[in-house]
């Protein structure tokens, strides 16, 4: 995840008078903005936000930028990363503190997360925001939203939990937490409607950002690769746990592909310094030729654009690969205990896991999950794309149609919906 970055100075609260104890959340300084004074002139609107990972940080930054167009003097505070800070949000805690996933991982970090949540909600209540916006991270954000809503603060949940995939009854719990749910995918609002939740499809900001026609040659030039090269992008995740579980398997699969395609170039983008160190260790013990493997800082989208095929973990990255129109193979493993619990309880409602497959209701990308996620099977699936260009060409119009369905000027629509909630008016999105 992103680092703490530049910290803003603020009112002394005693938070930094001592070093935090083990497990205690690391607070960033509070806003300069004074608390509103009863009877004083109307102050600018105040928005508090929480984004728990890199994708949420980007969504938050886009929303902040659009809200500033409507409210130039608005104030923004919360939990976020570099993108939200760049958009003008004063972060009290960094988004990286919430970057855990899976049942066993969450349990290990639970005491620290509970302390952080308690510290944040007390602080934000004192700051008195007009609207609180929880971005993704439902297990962390929804209790905060419910707590603040009970105290009279309007609440928004941006990015619906995957209620279409598992635990649909979460929609009922969201009804008591959020006044408004902003959905990225069109299949989500109808599910919420069954549970009486005000949910709006705003589109996906990533679909707005990415051109319909991707420029592979420009991406390769950026990375110093020949236009005639055969390129595989390998993205085993943006979290330490994901990379630990998938990195060696993915790199072994890449080596097997190299055995069939000797001139293959393998791009391995690292989300941050910690991920880069772990990936470098995995590359050093892999069989990949040094001259054919390229560990790069960030630039995941550029790596996908440059690639002929992408091997990646299930998640938002699959949507990005679809939007840049690249064939992909999806692999994923969770901690064994997490997998056994999910299977035992029958929590998963879908037969597909990759977002392009779910959106299309079709098998556009091979999915190799858990025990099926092994180097030999991943290699076979990758070679199937590389050796059948007609199959790749047939995929393009399917991807293009999905791209168009998601391209809705999402940040502007989300900001308009939040503005409607703030001003106490209905919003249908019809005029956006």
From Swiss-Prot:
Question: Entry's InterPro entries?
Answer: Glyco_trans_19
Can you name a GO cellular component term? membrane
Q: What is its EC number?
A: 2.4.1.182
Q: What is a biological process (GO) this protein takes part in?
A: lipid A biosynthetic process
Please describe what this protein does.
Answer: Condensation of UDP-2,3-diacylglucosamine and 2,3-diacylglucosamine-1-phosphate to form lipid A disaccharide, a precursor of lipid A, a phosphorylated glycolipid that anchors the lipopolysaccharide to the outer membrane of the cell.
Q: Which NCBIfam families match?
A: lpxB
Name-wise, this protein is: Lipid-A-disaccharide synthase
Source organism of the structure? Xanthomonas oryzae pv. oryzae (strain KACC10331 / KXO85)
Give the source lineage, highest ranks first: Bacteria, Pseudomonadati, Pseudomonadota, Gammaproteobacteria, Lysobacterales
Gene encoding it? lpxB
């Amino acid at each position: 995840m992103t680092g703490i970055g530049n910290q803003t100075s603020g009112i002394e609260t005693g938070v930094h008078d001592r070093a935090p104890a083990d497990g205690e959340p690391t607070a960033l300084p509070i806003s300069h903005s004074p608390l509103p004074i009863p009877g004083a002139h109307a102050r600018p609107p105040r928005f508090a936000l929480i984004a728990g990972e890199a994708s949420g940080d980007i969504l938050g930054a886009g929303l902040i930028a659009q809200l500033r167009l409507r409210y130039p003097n608005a104030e923004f505070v919360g939990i976020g990363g570099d993108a939200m800070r760049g958009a003008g949000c004063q972060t009290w805690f960094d988004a990286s503190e919430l970057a855990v996933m899976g049942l066993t991982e969450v349990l290990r970090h639970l005491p620290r997360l509970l302390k952080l949540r308690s510290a944040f909600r007390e602080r934000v209540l004192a700051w008195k925001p007009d609207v609180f916006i929880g971005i993704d991270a439902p297990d962390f954000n929804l209790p905060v939203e419910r707590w603040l809503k009970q105290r009279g603060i309007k609440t928004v949940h941006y990015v619906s939990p995957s209620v279409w995939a598992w635990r649909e009854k979460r929609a009922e719990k969201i009804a008591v937490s959020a006044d408004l749910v902003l959905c990225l995918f069109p299949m989500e609002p109808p599910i919420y409607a069954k549970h009486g939740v005000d949910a709006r499809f705003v589109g996906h900001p990533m679909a707005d950002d990415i051109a319909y026609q991707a420029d592979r040659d420009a991406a390769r030039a950026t990375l110093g690769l020949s236009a005639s090269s055969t390129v595989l992008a390998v993205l085993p995740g943006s979290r330490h746990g994901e990379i630990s579980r998938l990195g060696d398997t993915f790199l072994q699969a890449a080596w097997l592909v190299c055995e069939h395609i000797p001139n293959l170039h393998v791009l391995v983008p690292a989300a941050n310094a910690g991920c880069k160190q772990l990936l470098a260790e995995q590359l050093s013990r892999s069989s990949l030729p040094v001259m054919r493997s390229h560990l790069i800082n960030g630039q995941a989208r550029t790596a996908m654009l440059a690639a002929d095929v992408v091997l990646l973990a299930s998640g938002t990255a699959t949507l990005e690969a679809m939007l840049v129109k690249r064939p992909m193979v999806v692999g994923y493993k969770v901690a064994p205990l997490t997998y056994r619990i999910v299977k035992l309880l029958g929590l998963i409602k879908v037969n597909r896991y990759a977002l392009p497959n779910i959106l299309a209701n079709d098998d556009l990308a091979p999915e190799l999950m858990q025990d099926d996620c092994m180097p030999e099977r991943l290699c076979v699936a990758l070679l199937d794309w590389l050796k059948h260009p007609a199959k790749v060409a047939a995929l393009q119009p399917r991807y293009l149609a999905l791209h168009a369905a998601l391209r809705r000027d999402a940040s502007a629509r989300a900001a308009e919906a939040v503005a409607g909630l703030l001003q106490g008016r209905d919003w249908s999105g019809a005029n956006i």
